[in-house]
């Protein structure tokens, strides 16, 4: 199993960043996803270059600004996927996102990491708009 981690400082309040990420039906910050459908705690979408993906939302905690989800259906056989996004205040008008993803088999780690990086850039674009 590989554990990926990104820690990023954003020029917005923690509350504003949480508003973007806690809306699990929102896809404007993920460049490879056009739309998301929700059924209970499951979100499904088509991801460019990947295909149909279904994720289970395990935790969407407003108080601790933590989102946790797991890919449970993907075109490729993934034995384990667990992503956690934690937001904290980093002072006046700034927020820190710590995003970790556990992935197994490790062969998928580079692709998952690339997806994290382009999504972080997507978040920055949403904040700036």
Feature-to-residue mapping (PLM):
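Glycine-rich portal/gate segments that line the openings of hydrophobic small-molecule binding cavities
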Residues: 25-76, 96
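Short beta-strand-to-loop capping motifs
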Residues: 10-12, 47, 101-103
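Residue-level signal for tight coil/turn positions that link beta-strands
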Residues: 5, 12, 40, 62-64, ...
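Hydrophobic/aromatic beta-strand elements that line small-molecule binding cavities or substrate pockets
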Residues: 8, 53-59, 71, 82-89
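Short coil/turn motifs at beta-sheet boundaries
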Residues: 1, 48, 62, 78-80, ...
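Beta-strand/loop substructures that line and gate deep hydrophobic ligand-binding cavities in soluble
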Residues: 73-129
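Intrinsic-disorder/low-complexity, polar/charged segments enriched in Ser/Thr/Lys/Arg/Asp/Glu/Gln
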Residues: 3-7, 42, 52, 80-82, ...
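Hydrophobic ligand-binding cavity/cleft-lining segments
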Residues: 1-37
